[in-house]
Amino acid sequence: MTTVFVDADACPVTRDAIALARSRSVPVVLVANHSQNLAQYAGRSGVEILQVASGRDSADFAMVPRLSPGDVVVTGDTGLAAMALSRRCRVISPRGREYLAAVIDAELAVRHAEQRHRRAGGRTTGPSPFQPEDRERFREVLARMLAAGTVAGPGATPPRTDPGPLNS
C-alpha cells in the first residue's frame, strides 16, 4: 500500500498532504525533529508522527529505511529526494514540482556547487517566498499522483506530471 511521507521540518503543505491522502484513505507519516510542533496532528486517523532527535539530516535518515517502492515523499530537500528516488518512490516538492530520476544527478551537482561557493564566502539566492500558487500546484500534482496510484517495480518509470516540451 502506498504511504505519503512528509519531511515535516518547516513544510508549508503538511495539512494539504494530510487532507489529500486521507481523502483517498492513504496513510501519512510525518517525520520531523523534536523542535517541530506536530502535536496538532496527534491522534488523527491515518496519520503517524515520527519525531527524531535534532541534528543535520536526522529526519532524512529516519525516513529512508521506511520507504517502499511506490510511496510518495514530500520534501524540498534534493538529497532526500535522491535517496527516495533510488528506492523507487515518487517525490514532490512543497511547491508542486515532481523530482525525476532522469535529472536528480544534475540537481545534486548544482546543490554541491552552490554549497562550495557559499563555503568560499560567495552568496547564492534562496528560494522565492512561498505563494498561494505554489500550494495550489502542490495540491494538483499530489492529487494526480494519488489518483493515478504509483508505479513500482524494477525499472518502472512513474508517469510524468510536468507538461513536457511545448509544441509551437
Features from the language model and the residues they span:
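Nuclease catalytic cores that cleave nucleic-acid phosphodiester bonds
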Residues: 2-168
